[in-house]
């Protein structure tokens, strides 16, 4: 794969209160009754300067917010956590109560205690404390997956057990030399630290640099860049950062990977003890890791760029964790940045070699993807559905769970839902992968096939909404469950959803008894490959748990959802997050891939041979 692709390839509400005034104080404080004096700070920190900074929220001017700059770290912006919470939520108030030398923070779904002397935050309801999913839909539980599709509905989330001993979440900022401060009634964190803590699987995130705060609440990985592209490009145009920013930038990376990473299990850093001894010590254990550390700690942004390049290899998990994300930045600036990095490669032999190792891995996957694509095209042509001559076996091709035609679904669900309305919806079968799946089911039912293969051999992932809806229809049951873990809290979770399988706009028992397509008379199997990743891996995981055979070869893994972040100076990256790490129904790690059902494994020469697949399904 060319280096240019490294920078561009992504492997992957509650009502917003309009705000045009300055956010001067958004804390509901509870101090000693009858005492009008300013409380004495516990850790005021060194001298500081407050600065009013403009806010852009989802592309709209959103007033100003006060940021604080302490004299020992003049380049690092701090913000009251209550102000930050109000920014992210569009007006929700965090209640801050001082209790001796501690602060109790309360949001609508959780609480946390902060010790500014010892620089830590502790919470027994952490997922709820930082929860923003209620902004997407009011009934969503913290850390649930939902992309807003009208045909699937969240029902409940159950924490059924734990997989590690825990007395709550403790974030020890002092371990990373991240100082917390207060003014007697408010608690101040680095802006970048709070942005990392609050970012979630629905891509709510924020950034500050160059005198502007950007907040994104849109369901898109790179919205924070597309909101203000020229602004997003500025960190990549700088040759250097200050010494205090370089130090903090590295320490914040250490904090993120020690605490917020999902630990899928496959990365070189994990194999070198990152979970046990931390990011910094794991770098020391990796060959040439100390060189990478030096680059990541440098004030020189070319050094830092090559540190990022090396880390992309060391933390490579198939694509969910990536340091090569520039999408949304103006193309001319992207091109100039890539050119400058390319021209400097000889100056970074160790990092360059690591990058080349990553290229080898990615090229192998790309070669396999092309090979399978060519084989399938030769066998079927460019189609979404194919049946054998005898019409006994059909195959539905599902290359992605990503593409959605929201307008088509909105129009359908607002209609009378007549046959004509349904046929109008079906016209979007090439633009919406779930509609494409329904189109394939309609063809299979019309052909009267008794064997159905779901071909996900080239599926790189997408939305859990579509995965869940597909599974519900195939098993003729409106209920679909997702098994997963919260890697930070240590919980084993089951998320339950209902699917509107008859597409009448109502979630009820008719979805069990009278679905749009009844597949119960078919023998159904999933055809998988190592290319199938992320939701392309989750689909065979669920199908196997629900008793359907998996054919071909093991899937490609990719169990954690994505959390989008920025480095402390504003450069994009994303990680496999702790918030949701999918498992099988026994809460076993599946990142190595879902293996075929016994007797259903076979070579690529049989993948697209419908007669061969028929014999397998008729066993």
What annotation goes with each model-predicted range?
Residues 2-13:
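Bacterial N-terminal signal peptides that target proteins for export
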Residues 3, 19-44:
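Bacterial Sec-dependent N-terminal signal peptides
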Residues 33-66, 234-238:
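N-terminal low-complexity, Pro/Thr/Ser-rich intrinsically disordered segments
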Residues 67-78:
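Short, contiguous acidic and Ser/Thr-rich linear segments
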Residues 76-92, 187-201:
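Amphipathic, non-transmembrane alpha-helical segments in extracytoplasmic/periplasmic proteins
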Residues 87-121, 203-209:
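Extended intrinsically disordered, low-complexity coil regions enriched in Ser, Thr, Gly, Ala
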Residues 109, 113, 125-452, 458-460, ...:
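Flexible, low-complexity junctional segments that flank or bridge functional domains
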Residues 229-240, 247-250, 254, 391, ...:
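C-terminal "post-core" interaction segments
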């Amino acid at each position: 794969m060319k280096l240019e692709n490294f920078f561009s390839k992504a492997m992957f509400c509650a009502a917003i209160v309009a705000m045009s005034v300055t956010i001067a104080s958004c804390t509901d404080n509870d101090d000693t009754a009858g005492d009008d004096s300013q409380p004495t700070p516990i850790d005021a920190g060194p001298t500081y300067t407050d600065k009013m900074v403009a806010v852009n929220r989802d592309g709209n001017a959103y007033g100003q917010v006060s940021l604080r700059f302490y004299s020992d770290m003049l380049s690092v912006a701090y913000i009251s956590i209550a102000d930050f919470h109000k920014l992210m939520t569009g007006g929700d108030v965090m209640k801050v109560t001082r209790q001796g030398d501690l602060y109790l923070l309360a949001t609508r779904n959780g609480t946390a205690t902060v010790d500014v002397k010892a620089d830590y935050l502790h919470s027994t309801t952490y997922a709820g404390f930082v929860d923003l999913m209620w902004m997407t839909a009011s009934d969503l539980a913290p850390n649930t997956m939902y992309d807003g599709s009208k045909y699937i509905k969240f029902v409940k989330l159950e924490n059924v057990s734990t997989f590690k001993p825990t007395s709550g979440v403790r974030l020890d900022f002092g371990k990373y030399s991240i100082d917390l401060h207060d003014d007697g009634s408010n608690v101040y964190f680095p802006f970048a630290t709070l942005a990392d803590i609050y970012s979630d699987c629905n891509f709510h995130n924020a950034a500050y640099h160059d005198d502007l705060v950007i907040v994104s609440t849109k369901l898109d990985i790179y919205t924070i860049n597309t909101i203000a592209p020229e602004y997003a490009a500025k960190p990549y145009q700088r040759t250097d950062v200050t010494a205090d920013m370089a130090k903090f930038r590295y320490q914040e990376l250490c904090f993120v990977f020690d605490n917020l990473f999902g630990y899928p299990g496959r990365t070189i850093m994990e194999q070198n003890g990152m979970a046990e001894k931390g990011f910094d010590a794991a770098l020391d254990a990796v060959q040439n890791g100390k060189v990478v550390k030096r680059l990541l700690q440098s004030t020189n942004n070319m050094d830092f760029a090559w540190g990022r390049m090396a880390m992309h290899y060391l933390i490579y998990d198939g694509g969910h964790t990536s340091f090569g994300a520039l999408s949304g930045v103006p193309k001319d600036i992207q091109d100039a940045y890539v050119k400058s990095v390319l021209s400097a490669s000889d100056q970074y032999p160790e990092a360059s070699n690591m990058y080349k190792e990553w290229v080898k891995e990615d090229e192998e996957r790309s070669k396999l993807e092309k090979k399978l694509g060519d084989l399938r095209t030769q066998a079927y042509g460019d189609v979404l559905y194919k049946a054998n001559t005898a019409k006994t076996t059909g195959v539905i091709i599902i290359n992605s769970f990503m593409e959605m035609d929201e307008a088509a679904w909105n129009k359908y669900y607002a209609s009378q839902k007549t046959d004509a309305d349904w046929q109008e919806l079906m016209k979007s079968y090439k633009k919406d992968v779930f509609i494409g799946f329904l189109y394939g089911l309609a063809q299979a039912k019309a052909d009267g096939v008794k064997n159905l293969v779901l071909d996900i051999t080239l599926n790189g992932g997408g939305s859990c909404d579509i995965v869940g809806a597909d599974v519900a229809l195939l098993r003729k049951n409106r209920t679909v469950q997702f098994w997963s873990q919260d890697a930070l809290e240590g919980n084993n979770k089951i998320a339950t959803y209902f699917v509107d399988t008859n597409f009448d706009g109502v979630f009820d028992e008719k979805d069990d008894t009278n679905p749009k397509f009844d597949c119960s008379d078919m023998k159904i199997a999933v055809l998988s490959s190592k290319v199938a990743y992320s939701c392309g891996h989750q689909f065979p995981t669920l199908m196997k748990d629900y008793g359907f055979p998996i054919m071909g070869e093991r899937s490609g893994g990719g169990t954690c959802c994505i959390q989008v972040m920025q480095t402390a100076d504003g450069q994009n990256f994303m990680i496999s997050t702790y918030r949701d790490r999918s498992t099988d129904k026994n809460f076993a790690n599946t990142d190595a891939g879902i293996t075929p059902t016994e007797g259903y494994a076979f070579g690529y020469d049989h993948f697209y041979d419908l007669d061969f697949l028929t014999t397998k399904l008729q066993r």
